[in-house]
Amino acid sequence: MKIEGKRVVVTGAASGIGRALAHAFNDKGASKVVCADINFEEAQNTADSINGHAIKCNVGDENEIQDLVQESTDWMEGIDIFCSNAGIMGEIGLLETSSEKWQSIWEINVMAHVYAAKAVLP
């Protein structure tokens, strides 16, 4: 896939794979990269390092995903690539992880991708 000139959104861009993806898209010639994460300060650090734009977003909240898509579209005048990367892990095991944590894992690791697809597709 040709990345040069593309407008890209990366969720989970505050650290790890998301940060690496933001850098990779930038290095491959993306025209603009939005770095989205619930941890705004670290997303801003990533964005600053690549001349991108940071947006705070809890991807487990459908309204925040819609806002992310709108703000990204406004800043970049469109979105060519939406990299839905954000994810979280549970505790040590099934019994040690609270029901509330499982709900959060479900929202972020599963539903966030549904919310993103609904928000970004025409």
Regions found by a protein language model. Give the residues of each.
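Canonical Rossmann dinucleotide-binding motif of NAD(H)/NADP(H)-dependent dehydrogenases/reductases
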Residues: 3-32
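Conserved glycine-rich Rossmann-like NAD(P)H-binding loop of the short-chain dehydrogenase/reductase
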Residues: 30-43
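The beta1-alpha1 cofactor-binding region of Rossmann-like NAD(H)/NADP(H)-dependent oxidoreductases
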Residues: 40-41, 57-67, 99
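Conserved catalytic-site loops of classical short-chain dehydrogenases/reductases
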Residues: 80-81, 103
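Conserved NAD(P)H cofactor-binding loop of Rossmann-fold oxidoreductase domains
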Residues: 85-90
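Substrate-binding pocket helix/loop in short-chain dehydrogenase/reductase
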Residues: 93-94, 101-106
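A short, exposed helix-loop element centered on a Lys and neighboring polar residues
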Residues: 117-118
